[in-house]
Amino acid sequence: VHTVMSLAAIFGDNIGIEQSSIITALIVVQFVGFPATLFWSYIGNKFSDKFVIYSTIFIYFCGVIFSMFLSTSTEFFNLAALIGSVQGGIQAASRSLFSKLIPPHQSGEFFGLYNTFGRAGAVMGPALVGLFIGIFESIRIAVLPVIILFFLGAAILYFVKVNPSNFQNT
């Protein structure tokens, strides 16, 4: 998620999207994001945080695939709206799920660790994309590591067992 957020403008610029359109797209993400986060919150309460995370990972996955083929500002805006529709939901559901997995009396320490891993991901993801750009000389192919990272995240999440007795943490 951090990789997508940090590379969106660079990606748009590299495929020929005008700066004004990139800025507009980033604003679209914010306007779509607020109501979408409320929607995902409802879905999380109705089903589960894991369901929201899996669903939003799938949508991110589709967005990354779509990004490999887009070429116009309109397509870039559509991608921005798609990403905006899941960005807040995946972040909120991830934090909610994490809070259900940690000891309540150590939440500060664990959320500090959570943020550290998030920041590490914001460095490692773009580094992988940069490596792929260096190897394949194409930013479109360079988004492949993002797909791999989403797949790995979903695979790891599969093994996470949520203990219902921890639900009082939220």
Predicted regions and their residues:
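Helix-loop junctions at membrane interfaces in 12-TM secondary transporters
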Residues: M68-L79
